[in-house]
């Protein structure tokens, strides 16, 4: 089996020649090569320049030996394309004019990806050409709740109290906004598939801010809408991932995604009963493990692999969240080697 097949086979619940591995945020600040590119342009310019986005997307494939590339972009380019003013600087992402009610939401439009998000699609085409089938390419978007949280709050937050209060207090506003975002995301993801993406990941970064009962209203149903909005004959797998979602895993599995990402707080063999047998699992090494001495890192990688073996079904090795900016590159390489080496035969 070739390196190109591992990731897709695992997403389908099959057993490849070895466990595939990639890392969320694998194209990022921990790589000197990324920092060299980033030093020349702003973050948003990097996202919107297809040649540069393609360059940094490809870096970890060659440097680390991972089994999938994930497009370098940002989840917030979609709200911007819908009509919001986005500022990305050292203070983090900001919407200076956040949504304050239904009237603001009605001014948002569903963008035409071929026109308003063309830079993303052009980057996908460039990456596909350079990869030449070496490994699959993952496209992505943010989940409706996570995007709505940013759009109402105006910036990142620990609790997103303004967004939660606004959506919980006004059901028509919540439904209208989340429905419009879902429609935009379905079109955006389908355009990524049409441009050549081999798989998709939906990031619900702030899923854990909601109680399970609220997530059942504001979160999972709208991810399901996005998945259902893709072409029914699609063959590319869809991954869904959220942070602090131990109590939400069953809901994530119910969205129709082919793979459920698990953060490091829930062992994979404990996640399996919550997810059920149908979906593959992705995860879930604590990102801090990549700072440990090699023997300790090896022990933690082996533990994840052992938990995945006990869980059964397909498994894509990943971190339980994004790779941290000060991660030693050599340790990230070692983790990839250890995953590929696998566990001794029983």
Annotate the PLM regions.
Residues 116-346:
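Active-site loop segments of alpha/beta catalytic cores
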Residues 91-129:
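A gly/proline- and charged-residue-enriched helix-loop-helix capping module
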Residues 1-90, 126, 298, 313, ...:
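N-terminal basic, low-complexity leaders that serve as flexible interaction/assembly modules and, when applicable
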Residues 42-44, 50, 89-91, 95-98, ...:
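N-terminal/domain-start segments enriched in small and hydrophobic, helix-friendly residues
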Residues 87-100, 157-164:
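A charged helix-plus-loop insertion that forms the helical arch/lid used to bind
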Residues 75-78, 93-94, 102, 144-146:
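A short acidic, glycine/proline-enriched capping/turn motif at secondary-structure boundaries
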Residues 1, 50-51, 114-117, 175:
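Generic detection of long, well-ordered alpha-helical segments
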């Amino acid at each position: 089996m070739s390196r190109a097949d591992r990731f897709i086979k695992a997403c389908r619940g099959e057993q490849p020649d070895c466990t595939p591995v990639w890392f969320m945020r694998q194209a990022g600040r921990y790589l000197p090569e990324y920092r060299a590119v980033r030093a020349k342009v702003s973050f948003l310019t990097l996202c919107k320049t297809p040649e540069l986005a393609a360059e940094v997307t490809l870096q970890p494939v060659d440097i680390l030996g991972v089994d999938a590339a994930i497009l370098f972009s940002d989840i917030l380019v979609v709200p911007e394309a819908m009509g919001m003013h986005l500022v990305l600087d050292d203070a983090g992402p900001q919407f200076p004019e956040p949504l304050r009610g239904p009237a603001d939401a009605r001014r948002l439009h569903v963008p035409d990806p071929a026109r308003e998000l063309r830079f993303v699609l052009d980057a996908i085409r460039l990456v596909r050409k350079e990869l030449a089938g070496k490994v699959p390419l993952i496209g992505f978007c943010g989940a409706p709740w996570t995007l709505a949280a940013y759009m109402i709050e105006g910036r990142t937050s620990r609790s997103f109290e303004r967004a939660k209060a606004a959506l919980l207090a006004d059901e028509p506003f919540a439904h209208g906004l989340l429905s419009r975002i879902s429609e935009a995301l379905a079109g955006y993801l389908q355009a990524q598939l049409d441009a050549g993406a081999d798989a998709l990941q939906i990031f619900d970064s702030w899923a854990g801010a909601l109680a399970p009962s609220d997530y059942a209203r504001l979160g999972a149903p709208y991810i399901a809408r996005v998945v259902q909005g893709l072409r029914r004959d699609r063959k590319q797998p869809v991954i869904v991932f959220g942070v602090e979602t131990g109590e939400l895993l069953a809901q994530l599995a119910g969205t129709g995604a082919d793979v459920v990402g698990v953060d490091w707080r829930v062992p994979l063999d404990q996640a399996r009963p919550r997810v059920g047998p149908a979906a593959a699992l992705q995860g879930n090494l604590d990102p801090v493990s990549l700072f440990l001495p090699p023997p300790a890192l090896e022990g933690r990688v082996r533990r994840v692999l052992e938990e995945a073996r006990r869980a059964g079904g397909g498994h894509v090795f990943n971190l339980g969240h994004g790779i941290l900016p000060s991660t030693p590159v050599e340790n990230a390489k070692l983790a990839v080697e250890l995953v590929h080496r696998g566990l001794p035969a029983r």
